Amino acid sequence: MPATVHNLGLRPSLLSAVLAEIRDRELQQDRMRFRRNLERCGEIFAYEISKVLPYVERDVQTSLGAARVPVLAEQPVIASILRAGLPLHQGLLNYFDHADNSFISAYRKHEGDADHFEVEIEYLSSPSVEGRTVILCDPMLATG
């Protein structure tokens, strides 16, 4: 599957209300609410992402008989840049609850000029991502 970008901000949705709270200076002071709103964003993202993933048909036995239903062809790998991405990661996991996880610890290493830096990776824990859908959850929030 090629890399794709879906701009969820093109149309008003529940995401708009959640982002309004995240950007609100007063509400930002409530750390628990801020983290929960990031988690809500992850849940909304997961739902939207699920619409473009590949599915296969599977038979399930219901109380009324057999039914053919679409299920994900393969679970994604949810990758997070530690720490800021953790609430967003959890929101995605709330929906992709059988997904594999990948965690990366990285920081900007500045040398000399403040405008130039290298990304230093200190830690990486990940399953093989070869041929897999990887969802990178890194909020990189700019709330000003």
Regions flagged by a language model, labelled:
Residues M1-G144:
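PRPP-associated nucleotide enzymes
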